[in-house]
Curated annotation (Swiss-Prot):
Keywords: ATP-binding, Kinase, Magnesium, Metal-binding, Nucleotide-binding, Transferase. Homodimer. The record marks 175, 236 as: Transition state stabilizer. It comes from Escherichia coli O157:H7. The active site is at residue 143. This is Propionate kinase.
Length: 402
């Protein structure tokens, strides 16, 4: 066993690899970076926020070799005791994280048609890491597995049964690693018993989802079979009437593929504002009186509040509403507008606490008189993945979750 073991966390996207190296004893981040533009001539690697360096080899394997070389330069290569992989979709097969074996790889491949853009990239990352770090225990952490505790009435669609039985058409949910980490932290921050609690977690970023967590388990979530369902997002429409899209197709002669591009890439904040999918740009425009930017933000907020209230119905009681993700953690405007919408639930805002920057970390942003506590908890998916790897790999597990 390594004297000073570290965990390498790998997140292979459709054209990028994000990575972090964490100390196995306390999960402190020792280095991090991103390889982007994979499989293109513009592929580059940036480490610890430094200047991007062109990659000599543009494949996933080439990018991971470059990452391994960066570890070697810092004398960390031989310290890698565990590797944790973020896997986009585990289907109904994976209800929890798993040590990677040939059988696990085969099962990931089986469910990959459910998330072809990401799962096949995840598999490339696993295969390359096995070659670069032979003998190192690797762990798969699935974005969907936290939601496998949902009851059938929460995950089934009102479609003919054969589509579920034969094709696996159902709600799977995403952002599970984030929702799990944040709900665990919330129990500590709000002094709640994990086995007797009710939380609604709002992961708000360019992709966004809501999760109802009852007694530490996901019982409902807004994303569906794909990450398109639920909230309006940066470029995704979120919930939309299928009949409306069918009518658009009939009027414009667009194909299913065309419309899929529209609802995934051209809608949401970008679609309504006509300006940007970046909330920071839209907030600036909001204050400058840009009407469509204001309308985009109001629609975004309305959908968030409606989904939070709806997800509360899946709980026996509502102890807290937790904001996380890039927008949830950093936008005091969005939090304020959402909380104002939720006055019906007994939510009251503490303006001073809400206006504090994210550098303050975990914090309660509701007033002392509020019936429901609202809090901000920065997510840390890399730490959650590392903790799962440490737990399964039994390498000097940290004494405390925090």
């Amino acid at each position: 066993m390594n004297e000073f073991p570290v965990v390498l966390v790998i997140n292979c996207g459709s054209s990028s690899i994000k990575f972090s190296v964490l100390d196995a004893s306390d999960c402190e981040v020792l280095m991090s970076g991103i390889a982007d533009g994979i499989n293109s001539e513009n592929a580059f690697l940036s480490v610890n926020g430094g200047e991007p360096a062109p990659l000599a080899h543009h494949s996933y394997e080439g990018a991971l070799k470059a990452i391994a070389f960066e570890l070697e330069k810092r004398n960390l290569n031989d310290s890698v005791a565990l590797i944790g992989h973020r896997i986009a979709h585990g289907g109904s097969i994976f209800t929890e994280s798993a040590i990677i074996t040939d059988e696990v790889i085969d099962n990931i491949r089986r469910v990959s048609p459910l998330a072809p853009l990401h799962n096949y990239a995840n598999l490339s990352g696993i295969e390359s890491a096995q070659q670069l770090f032979p003998g190192v225990t690797q762990v798969a952490v699935f974005d969907t597995s936290f939601h496998q505790t949902m009851a059938p009435e929460a995950y089934l669609y009102g479609l003919p049964w054969k589509y579920y039985e034969e094709l696996g058409v159902r709600r799977y949910g995403f952002h599970g690693t984030s929702h799990r980490y944040v709900s665990l932290r919330a129990h500590s921050l709000l002094n709640l018993a994990e086995d007797d609690s009710g939380l609604v977690v709002a992961h708000l970023g360019n992709g966004a989802s809501i999760c109802a967590v009852r007694n530490g388990q996901s019982v409902d979530t807004s994303m569906g079979m794909t990450p398109l369902e639920g909230l309006m997002m940066g470029t995704r429409s979120g919930d939309v009437d299928f009949g409306a899209m069918s009518w658009v197709a009939s009027q414009t002669n667009q194909s299913l593929g065309d419309l899929e591009r529209v609802v995934n890439k051209e809608s949401g904040l970008l679609g309504i504002s006509g300006l940007s999918s970046d909330l920071r740009v839209l907030e600036k425009a909001w204050h400058e009186g840009h009407e469509r930017a204001q309308l985009a933000i109001k629609t975004f907020v309305h959908r968030i509040a409606r989904h939070i209230a709806g997800h509360a119905a899946s709980l026996r009681r509502l102890d807290g509403i937790i904001f996380t993700g890039g927008i949830g953690e950093n936008s005091s405007l969005i939090r304020r507008l959402v909380m104002e919408h939720l006055a019906v639930l007994g939510v009251e805002i503490d303006t001073e606490m809400n206006n504090r920057s994210n550098s303050f970390g975990e914090r309660i942003v509701s007033s002392e008189n509020a019936r429901v506590i609202c809090a901000v908890i920065p997510t840390n998916e890399e730490k959650m993945i590392a903790l799962d790897a440490i737990h399964l790999g039994k390498v000097n597990a940290p004494a405390e979750f925090a």
